[in-house]
A protein has these predicted regions:
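Short, active-site-adjacent segments that bind or coordinate small-molecule cofactors and metal centers
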Residues: 108-153
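Short beta-strand segments
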Residues: 24-56
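Short, structured beta-strand-loop surface elements
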Residues: 57-120, 125-127
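Extreme N-terminal tail/first-helix region
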Residues: 1-22, 142-153
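Beta-strand residues in well-ordered beta-sheet regions across diverse protein folds
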Residues: 30-32, 54, 72, 124, ...
Length: 153
């Protein structure tokens, strides 16, 4: 037990993790770009045990297709005071076969802005992990462990 009498971190089952993935609408795609990590927020859906999102030509497409990626989703429930996160690691592939494209186009997955997102990416999971924990009460959460430092110039 943690100092506050609650379990510090609960490891979620795969089923619980997928349940949270189905509830969220925005996740973060983590990729390597020019030997540097980068993160892209994307709206997505869970479909057939995988993550599906739409994108356009560009860095996100070039840095994800055919590569191992990480995909993270998190949330906070103010009524219970619990936060959670789920991470999927797997290979991203572009959906190209006609029957898969037609199925994906039937999903209620639409771009959030006017730029066309004609490419459909599917992340096939190799690992799924999730955690849930109780957030500290406000005074403890806002107490700095050390004095803040100025940002580098």
């Amino acid at each position: 037990m943690g100092d506050n009498g609650r379990e510090p971190v609960k490891v979620l089952s795969t089923s619980e993790s997928w349940g949270l993935l189905r509830e969220a609408v925005v996740g973060r795609l983590a990729v390597m770009v020019d030997d540097q990590p980068d993160i892209f927020p994307v709206n997505y859906l869970v479909d057939h045990g995988s993550i599906v999102f739409r994108t356009a030509e560009g860095t996100k497409l070039a840095s994800s297709v055919g590569r191992l990626v990480a995909f993270e989703v998190d949330g906070y429930d103010s009524s219970s005071g619990e936060a959670w996160s789920v991470v999927i690691k797997g290979k991203a592939r572009e959906v190209k076969q006609l029957h898969e494209v037609l199925e994906a186009l039937d999903l209620p997955l639409f771009p959030w802005h006017a730029a066309p997102k004609r490419r459909i990416i599917r992340i096939e999971p190799e690992a799924v992990s999730g955690r849930r924990f109780h957030v500290l009460d406000a005074p403890a959460r806002h107490m700095p462990a050390r004095p803040p430092r100025a940002a580098p110039e």
